[in-house]
Amino acid sequence: MARLGLLLLLLLALPPHFSSVSWPDTAQGTMANLILTALEKATLFLEDRLPTINLDGVVGFQVLEVQLRGVQEKWAHKPLLQPLSMRAGQMANTLSALLQKSIFYLKQSDPTYLREFQPSIQPGFWKLPNDWTRTNASLVYPWLEPLDSFSEESSDVCLVQLLGTGTDSSQPCRLSNFCRTLMTKAGCSGYSLSHQLLFFLWARMQGCTEGLFLQSQHYMDIFCANMMELNHRAEAVGYAYPTQDLFMENIMFCGMAGFSDFYKLRWLEAILSWQNPQVGCFGRPDTKGEPSEVPHQQGILRRVRRREKLFADGCSCHNTATAVAALGGFLYILAEYHPDNGDAHPEYYPNHGDPYSSSQSPASNYQDGAAGPDVQRTGRPLSVS
């Protein structure tokens, strides 16, 4: 933590222009090295426990592989960054082999779940955002609905309909009235909210553009604004253990949806501090006296959560999956916005400053060319706000 705190101070002290400094020797280079090291440890954890990793764990590492490929591509032709590019590429290659091997074990442990959600772990499914925006605080709900009606089973039904992987041999992008109502329901929180976002995010990845999916960006704007609010609440209670998984899931999903303000330096610092340094996983902390529940949030944190796999040493498949995908997003946005790309270095705004208008209409385009609304884009995504 002391090293991370020093890193944050170094980032805040950087001058606006430092192109004469060797990039790997700057604070950004140090930060990239810290992230890569954490991800390498997590990859070793995946390799060590591959026969027992569930599908949710595989999804997180699949997202990470895509992010690492993006980082490798951006750094490959930068002489100063080639060592970092090679590390990212080598890790991506390792993950590719491990993820292919994981399908063998998943067919044995949970064949039905694999059949239903296999598209989410297939190469080419996840696509990186090409443009970035920020959440709009005016879209935060003034109220929260009870979560009893939003079960994991209901979420699965709608996601399977969307993917077209049900037993009825339906086509992708299918939408029943039940799922239309459930996935656009206002006032949801916790995992219900993140799965609403996941539904429209997967619709974008699948190329669903008709009917309700014409409004996918509208709903992602709403959901990520509220997921940002929940992350601020998690931060306010000191990231108590039960909140960490949802906190990282929100960064993973909204980051992939193109919302740059989820990539805050202080949140990166927090996530890096949660890794088990010996095993490489994320999960229940060793610290005695850690609160086991967060008042008024127990129901939110326990509902609509993908199948969990906990190990005896406290490692969690789901926590580790969301952590690596969140960290991969931090690395990707760092690779996209640094001086060698010709951009001014990202501005850092302490004391919760916000350089962007909260009324700005969010939108996001993806590298596959799926179009979003034509609005002004933001250009400096990494901040400490």
Swiss-Prot record:
Pfam family, one: DUF4735
Compositional bias of kind Polar residues: 356-367
Signal sequence, renumbered to the chain: 1-20
PTM section of the record: Glycosylated.
Domain of life per record: Eukaryota
Record keywords, A-Z: Glycoprotein, Secreted, Signal
Bilayer-spanning residue ranges: none
Subcellular location(s) per record: Secreted
Tissue and organ distribution: Predominantly expressed in thyroid tissue.
InterPro entries: DUF4735
Complex formation: Homodimer.
Family as reported in the entry's similarity comment: Belongs to the UPF0764 family.
Name the UniProt record assigns to this protein: UPF0764 protein C16orf89 homolog
